[in-house]
Design a protein with these regions (language model features):
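Proline-aspartate-enriched helix->loop->beta-strand connector
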Residues: 155-157
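A short, gly/pro- and small-residue-rich
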Residues: 113-117, 171-188
Length: 214
Protein backbone atom coordinates (compact mmCIF):
# COMPACT_ATOMS: atom_id res chain seq x y z
CA UNK A 1 0.00 0.00 0.00
CA UNK A 2 1.43 3.42 -0.93
CA UNK A 3 2.73 5.49 1.95
CA UNK A 4 1.29 8.85 2.96
CA UNK A 5 4.29 10.56 1.36
CA UNK A 6 3.59 8.79 -1.94
CA UNK A 7 -0.06 9.81 -1.85
CA UNK A 8 0.96 13.38 -1.13
CA UNK A 9 3.45 13.34 -4.00
CA UNK A 10 0.78 12.14 -6.42
CA UNK A 11 -1.71 14.73 -5.13
CA UNK A 12 0.80 17.50 -5.78
CA UNK A 13 1.49 16.15 -9.27
CA UNK A 14 -2.22 16.03 -10.07
CA UNK A 15 -2.74 19.58 -8.84
CA UNK A 16 0.14 20.83 -10.95
CA UNK A 17 -1.16 18.95 -13.98
CA UNK A 18 -4.63 20.41 -13.46
CA UNK A 19 -3.16 23.89 -13.16
CA UNK A 20 -1.17 23.39 -16.36
CA UNK A 21 -4.28 22.19 -18.18
CA UNK A 22 -6.33 25.13 -16.91
CA UNK A 23 -3.56 27.54 -17.89
CA UNK A 24 -3.43 26.06 -21.36
CA UNK A 25 -7.20 26.24 -21.70
CA UNK A 26 -7.20 29.89 -20.62
CA UNK A 27 -4.48 30.63 -23.18
CA UNK A 28 -6.54 28.97 -25.92
CA UNK A 29 -9.54 31.08 -24.94
CA UNK A 30 -7.43 34.22 -25.08
CA UNK A 31 -5.97 33.46 -28.50
CA UNK A 32 -9.35 32.42 -29.86
CA UNK A 33 -10.72 35.88 -29.19
CA UNK A 34 -10.11 38.45 -26.49
CA UNK A 35 -13.44 39.36 -24.88
CA UNK A 36 -14.60 42.94 -25.38
CA UNK A 37 -16.15 43.09 -21.91
CA UNK A 38 -13.73 44.90 -19.59
CA UNK A 39 -14.63 42.87 -16.51
CA UNK A 40 -14.21 39.61 -18.39
CA UNK A 41 -10.78 40.71 -19.61
CA UNK A 42 -9.79 41.58 -16.06
CA UNK A 43 -11.01 38.15 -14.93
CA UNK A 44 -8.79 36.56 -17.57
CA UNK A 45 -5.82 38.54 -16.26
CA UNK A 46 -6.52 37.36 -12.72
CA UNK A 47 -6.89 33.73 -13.83
CA UNK A 48 -3.65 33.89 -15.79
CA UNK A 49 -1.82 35.43 -12.86
CA UNK A 50 -2.97 32.79 -10.39
CA UNK A 51 -2.45 29.88 -12.76
CA UNK A 52 0.96 31.15 -13.83
CA UNK A 53 2.25 30.85 -10.27
CA UNK A 54 1.25 27.19 -10.25
CA UNK A 55 2.47 26.43 -13.76
CA UNK A 56 5.81 28.04 -12.98
CA UNK A 57 6.31 25.34 -10.35
CA UNK A 58 6.03 22.78 -13.13
CA UNK A 59 8.50 24.80 -15.17
CA UNK A 60 11.05 24.68 -12.36
CA UNK A 61 10.72 20.90 -12.17
CA UNK A 62 11.14 20.57 -15.94
CA UNK A 63 13.81 23.28 -16.21
CA UNK A 64 11.48 25.25 -18.48
CA UNK A 65 10.68 28.23 -16.26
CA UNK A 66 12.12 30.74 -18.74
CA UNK A 67 10.04 29.38 -21.63
CA UNK A 68 6.88 29.45 -19.52
CA UNK A 69 7.61 33.03 -18.45
CA UNK A 70 8.06 34.13 -22.05
CA UNK A 71 4.77 32.47 -23.00
CA UNK A 72 3.02 34.24 -20.13
CA UNK A 73 4.36 37.62 -21.27
CA UNK A 74 3.24 36.85 -24.81
CA UNK A 75 -0.30 36.11 -23.66
CA UNK A 76 -0.50 39.29 -21.57
CA UNK A 77 0.74 41.32 -24.53
CA UNK A 78 -1.84 39.66 -26.76
CA UNK A 79 -4.64 40.66 -24.39
CA UNK A 80 -3.52 44.30 -24.54
CA UNK A 81 -2.61 44.65 -28.22
CA UNK A 82 -5.40 42.64 -29.83
CA UNK A 83 -7.49 45.80 -29.98
CA UNK A 84 -5.75 49.15 -30.69
CA UNK A 85 -5.74 51.44 -27.67
CA UNK A 86 -5.23 54.65 -29.72
CA UNK A 87 -4.03 56.53 -26.64
CA UNK A 88 -2.66 60.07 -26.73
CA UNK A 89 1.15 59.66 -26.89
CA UNK A 90 1.82 61.48 -23.62
CA UNK A 91 -0.39 58.98 -21.81
CA UNK A 92 1.98 56.15 -22.73
CA UNK A 93 5.08 55.58 -20.59
CA UNK A 94 8.12 53.71 -21.88
CA UNK A 95 10.28 52.18 -19.14
CA UNK A 96 13.76 50.78 -19.78
CA UNK A 97 16.26 49.11 -17.43
CA UNK A 98 19.56 50.75 -16.56
CA UNK A 99 21.43 47.70 -17.90
CA UNK A 100 20.71 48.90 -21.45
CA UNK A 101 23.13 51.77 -20.90
CA UNK A 102 26.77 51.23 -21.91
CA UNK A 103 28.61 50.25 -18.72
CA UNK A 104 31.42 52.77 -19.36
CA UNK A 105 29.06 55.71 -19.92
CA UNK A 106 29.82 58.62 -17.54
CA UNK A 107 26.40 60.23 -17.92
CA UNK A 108 23.64 59.58 -15.38
CA UNK A 109 20.35 58.99 -17.16
CA UNK A 110 18.21 57.32 -14.50
CA UNK A 111 16.88 60.68 -13.29
CA UNK A 112 16.96 62.48 -16.62
CA UNK A 113 17.20 60.54 -19.87
CA UNK A 114 18.02 63.79 -21.68
CA UNK A 115 21.53 63.47 -20.25
CA UNK A 116 22.10 60.79 -22.90
CA UNK A 117 24.61 62.01 -25.51
CA UNK A 118 23.29 59.57 -28.15
CA UNK A 119 26.76 58.32 -28.99
CA UNK A 120 25.42 55.05 -30.39
CA UNK A 121 27.27 52.75 -27.97
CA UNK A 122 23.97 51.58 -26.48
CA UNK A 123 20.29 51.64 -27.52
CA UNK A 124 19.30 54.42 -25.10
CA UNK A 125 19.96 57.10 -27.72
CA UNK A 126 17.72 55.40 -30.27
CA UNK A 127 15.01 54.89 -27.67
CA UNK A 128 15.20 58.55 -26.66
CA UNK A 129 14.88 59.65 -30.28
CA UNK A 130 11.98 57.24 -30.81
CA UNK A 131 10.11 58.50 -27.75
CA UNK A 132 10.59 62.10 -28.90
CA UNK A 133 9.41 61.31 -32.42
CA UNK A 134 6.25 59.62 -31.14
CA UNK A 135 5.72 62.05 -28.26
CA UNK A 136 5.89 59.30 -25.62
CA UNK A 137 7.22 59.68 -22.08
CA UNK A 138 10.46 57.75 -21.51
CA UNK A 139 12.35 56.86 -18.35
CA UNK A 140 15.34 54.66 -17.52
CA UNK A 141 15.11 52.99 -14.12
CA UNK A 142 17.59 50.88 -12.12
CA UNK A 143 14.97 48.69 -10.48
CA UNK A 144 11.37 47.98 -9.61
CA UNK A 145 11.12 50.50 -6.77
CA UNK A 146 12.02 53.48 -8.95
CA UNK A 147 9.88 52.09 -11.77
CA UNK A 148 6.84 52.15 -9.49
CA UNK A 149 7.71 55.70 -8.42
CA UNK A 150 7.91 56.84 -12.04
CA UNK A 151 4.56 55.23 -12.85
CA UNK A 152 2.98 56.89 -9.82
CA UNK A 153 4.44 60.28 -10.78
CA UNK A 154 3.59 60.13 -14.49
CA UNK A 155 0.18 58.50 -14.04
CA UNK A 156 0.11 57.04 -17.57
CA UNK A 157 -2.83 55.25 -19.15
CA UNK A 158 -0.54 52.46 -20.39
CA UNK A 159 3.03 51.26 -19.91
CA UNK A 160 5.51 49.65 -22.29
CA UNK A 161 8.45 48.08 -20.47
CA UNK A 162 11.73 46.54 -21.60
CA UNK A 163 13.31 44.06 -19.19
CA UNK A 164 14.13 40.42 -18.50
CA UNK A 165 11.43 37.81 -17.90
CA UNK A 166 11.41 38.12 -14.10
CA UNK A 167 11.30 41.92 -13.99
CA UNK A 168 8.72 42.15 -16.76
CA UNK A 169 6.32 39.78 -15.05
CA UNK A 170 6.63 41.40 -11.63
CA UNK A 171 6.30 44.87 -13.15
CA UNK A 172 3.30 44.01 -15.32
CA UNK A 173 1.58 42.51 -12.29
CA UNK A 174 2.47 45.49 -10.09
CA UNK A 175 0.82 48.05 -12.38
CA UNK A 176 -2.34 45.99 -13.03
CA UNK A 177 -5.07 46.82 -13.99
CA UNK A 178 -3.11 49.45 -15.95
CA UNK A 179 -2.45 48.09 -19.47
CA UNK A 180 1.21 47.03 -19.69
CA UNK A 181 3.08 45.50 -22.61
CA UNK A 182 6.46 43.85 -22.10
CA UNK A 183 9.37 43.49 -24.50
CA UNK A 184 12.22 41.17 -23.54
CA UNK A 185 15.69 42.63 -23.67
CA UNK A 186 18.57 40.92 -25.45
CA UNK A 187 21.46 39.66 -23.32
CA UNK A 188 24.48 39.05 -25.57
CA UNK A 189 26.84 39.71 -22.64
CA UNK A 190 24.82 37.88 -20.01
CA UNK A 191 22.14 39.21 -17.66
CA UNK A 192 22.12 42.82 -16.44
CA UNK A 193 25.21 43.91 -18.41
CA UNK A 194 25.26 45.90 -21.66
CA UNK A 195 21.91 44.47 -22.72
CA UNK A 196 20.13 45.40 -25.94
CA UNK A 197 16.62 45.75 -27.36
CA UNK A 198 14.95 45.21 -30.70
CA UNK A 199 14.19 48.81 -31.73
CA UNK A 200 12.00 47.69 -34.61
CA UNK A 201 9.80 45.56 -32.33
CA UNK A 202 9.65 48.39 -29.80
CA UNK A 203 8.58 50.84 -32.51
CA UNK A 204 5.77 48.51 -33.58
CA UNK A 205 4.50 48.13 -30.01
CA UNK A 206 4.57 51.86 -29.26
CA UNK A 207 2.91 52.68 -32.58
CA UNK A 208 0.15 50.17 -31.83
CA UNK A 209 -0.45 51.77 -28.44
CA UNK A 210 -1.01 55.21 -29.95
CA UNK A 211 -2.73 54.03 -33.12
CA UNK A 212 -0.01 55.02 -35.59
CA UNK A 213 1.75 53.09 -38.34
CA UNK A 214 5.24 51.91 -37.42
Amino acid sequence: MPSAAAWWDWAVRLCLAAAAAAYGFTWVCVLAGTPSNKRLRQLLFVCLRVLFSLVRCIGKLLYAESAISRAYIQVLNHLILRRPLCLPPRQVLLLAPHCLQWDQCPHKITRNVQNCRRCGRCPIGEMTALSERLGISFAVVPGGTLARQVVAACRPKAVVAVACERDLISGMQDVAPLPAVGLLNKRPNGPCFNTDVDIRALTEILSAMIGEDA
